[in-house]
């Protein structure tokens, strides 16, 4: 007798073959039979014509910060996702350094509340972090990347400079340890400090470490808009020089004037593969993106630290300088015209509202509103 029998399902087996109708038997957590009239089971599920297929792989996720908050991953499982690749965009939950803990938490705050992360207990060693995850009853499978921003902060904090030879060696050694522990590779978030401060050469050195383990590099490239082609070319050069597989994360062309550039970037990928590289990309099928509001602050200012940034935005004499710096880094044709508040701990009433609409209701300049929210939320 089987443990589970799923009957009358439209089966897609994942091989590329046409779908077919049948039953699936499960024993000890494994599929042991596919066909018709398979026999009895302790539990029978009548699919009644629904589709039964292998679980989907979410190739770009930030759920590694949420294991202890909601290990069921119900939202993912409900959509058929059974495996998640975590630690993307240069952000991972390990390794953390006691010396630069504030920097690591600042990076992690892009995707999770830092108060929660601290209360959960930061795991400083990558192997310790993986061992800890083994004891959490997660609702699906997961594969972990090492975030370059987290790795860089582990060694040198949020400094806007090139690493010394000693610091670069420390990053390489730490990445070796992470790969030995079971990491899939290294991810880059080149629009977010401190990853944004890395040179192409630094990435080649670190990617070469991942390549020794047949790993992969995933990159949120430096620019997804006006300089998209140059940004993709940089990462292809990193892949070529390091002999490492590359995935360009959420491949897209931001802002309507840049629509159509994806044809050129896809051509770059095809040409790279014809020359012997292994370059891939993932994407999502809608014209939107999601990131922290803090990303509106120019990269070169992030090295000042959160407290200094809040001080600058709160000081009437410095506020106009900050406003000009923020606006200078945005597309003049759009700026905050397409920006929506996804969440704000200090202002939950803004959730789901457009920045321009809230600014109009409050009779505030949109950029002034954004700076107020950043200060109130402590970035």
Annotate each predicted stretch with a short phrase.
Residues 5, 25, 58, 85, ...:
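Structured core elements
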Residues 59-67, 156-169, 192-198, 363:
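Active-site mouth loops of central-metabolism enzymes
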Residues 69-184, 277-279:
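Divalent-metal coordination cores built from histidine and acidic residues
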Residues 154, 163, 174-302:
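Functional cores that coordinate and move charged inorganic groups
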Residues 9, 24, 29, 49, ...:
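Divalent metal-coordination and catalytic microenvironments
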């Amino acid at each position: 007798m089987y443990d589970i029998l799923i009957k009358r399902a439209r089966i897609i087996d994942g091989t590329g073959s046409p779908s077919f109708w049948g039953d699936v038997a499960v024993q000890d957590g494994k599929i042991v039979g596919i066909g018709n009239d398979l026999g009895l089971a302790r539990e029978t599920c009548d699919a009644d014509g629904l589709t039964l297929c292998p679980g989907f792989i979410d190739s770009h996720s930030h759920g590694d910060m949420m294991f202890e908050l909601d290990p069921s991953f119900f939202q993912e499982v409900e959509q058929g996702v059974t495996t998640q690749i975590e630690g993307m965009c240069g952000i991972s939950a390990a390794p953390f350094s006691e010396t630069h803990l504030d920097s690591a938490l600042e990076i992690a705050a892009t995707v999770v509340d830092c108060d929660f992360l601290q209360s959960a207990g930061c795991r400083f060693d990558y192997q310790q972090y993986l061992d800890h995850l083994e004891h959490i009853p997660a609702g699906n499978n997961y594969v972990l990347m090492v975030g370059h921003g987290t790795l860089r902060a582990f060694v040198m904090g949020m400094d806007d400079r090139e690493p010394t030879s000693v610091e670069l060696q420390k990053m390489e050694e730490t990445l070796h340890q992470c790969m030995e522990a079971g990491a899939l590779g290294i991810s880059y978030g080149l629009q977010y400090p401190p990853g944004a401060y890395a040179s192409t050469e630094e990435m080649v050195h670190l990617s070469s470490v991942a390549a020794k383990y047949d790993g992969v590099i995933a990159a949120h490239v430096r620019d997804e808009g006006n300089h998209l082609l140059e940004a993709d070319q940089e990462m292809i050069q990193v892949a070529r020089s390091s002999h490492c597989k590359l995935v360009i994360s959420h491949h897209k062309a931001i802002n309507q004037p840049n629509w159509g550039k994806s044809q050129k970037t896809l051509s770059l990928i095809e040409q790279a593969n014809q020359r012997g590289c292994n370059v891939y990309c993932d994407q999502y099928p809608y014209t939107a993106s999601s990131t922290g509001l803090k990303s509106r602050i120019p990269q070169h200012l992030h090295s000042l630290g959160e407290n200094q940034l809040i001080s600058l935005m709160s000081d009437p004499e410095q506020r106009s300088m900050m406003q000009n710096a923020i606006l200078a880094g945005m597309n003049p044709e759009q700026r905050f015209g397409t920006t929506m508040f996804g969440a704000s701990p200090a202002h939950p009433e803004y959730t789901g509202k457009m920045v321009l609409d809230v600014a109009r209701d409050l009779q505030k300049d949109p950029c002034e509103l954004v700076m107020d929210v950043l200060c109130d939320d402590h970035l």
